């Protein structure tokens, strides 16, 4: 089987992709799930600097691979796309929302995240997650401004409504910065679209792969 690497979001689990993975298998692809640093199977991965994060990413995913990335994992894949040089990059509901929507500061975000991890006794290293959040968010660069040179499919949820409107407006404002990016909203989905509608998400991915890779075996 061919392979896609799947970079998780914060709080995502391997179990969450089970139906998505089955649908991917139907198209001849296996999915290798990767927890972000500080989380679950990668709880002991320490990130102290941007270089640590780049080295971790490079050790997990070979250059030129097919990559799917969700939420915080999407922010990682987008920011460090030049190190991945992905053959095909699929972004699931990430790389587009900044603090201007959430109306909070980086410090507030980190405090809330650490409290959530502690209160729910999650198998995470709160300090590593906090550092990861700081690295990605202190000087946030969205998908339209990182200079993507990789064929990229951005799949976005359309709920809740106020986030949907934010996304549509951001796309409209950045219509001149969309080289290499194809965008599709998944109807009647919220953030974890691959959990809610695994078949529809996978079908959208492979429709796109067929259109953009019609002369290759993707």
What are the roles of these predicted feature ranges?
Residues 156-189:
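Conserved loop-alpha-helix segment in the C-terminal half of the alpha/beta-hydrolase fold
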Residues 1-41:
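Conserved HGGG/HGGXW glycine-rich cap/lid loop of the alpha/beta-hydrolase fold
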């Amino acid at each position: 089987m061919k392979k896609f690497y799947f970079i998780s979001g914060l709080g995502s689990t391997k179990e969450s992709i089970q139906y998505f993975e089955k649908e991917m298998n139907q198209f001849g692809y296996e999915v290798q799930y990767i927890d972000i640093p500080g989380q679950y199977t990668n709880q002991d991965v320490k990130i102290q600097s941007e270089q640590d994060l780049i080295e971790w990413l490079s050790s997990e995913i070979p250059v030129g691979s097919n990559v799917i990335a969700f939420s915080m994992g999407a922010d990682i894949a987008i920011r460090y796309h030049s190190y991945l040089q992905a053959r095909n990059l699929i972004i699931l509901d990430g790389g587009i929302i900044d603090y201007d929507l959430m109306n909070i500061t980086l410090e507030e975000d980190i405090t809330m995240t650490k409290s959530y991890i502690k209160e729910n006794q999650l198998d995470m290293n709160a300090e590593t997650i906090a550092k990861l959040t700081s690295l990605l968010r202190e000087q946030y660069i969205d998908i339209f401004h990182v200079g993507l040179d990789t064929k990229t499919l951005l799949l976005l949820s359309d709920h809740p409504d106020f986030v949907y409107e934010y996304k549509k407006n951001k796309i409209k404002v950045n219509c001149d910065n969309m080289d290499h990016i194809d965008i599709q909203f998944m109807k009647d989905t919220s953030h974890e679209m691959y959990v809610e509608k695994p078949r529809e998400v996978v079908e959208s991915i492979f429709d796109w792969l067929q259109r953009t890779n019609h002369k290759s075996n993707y």
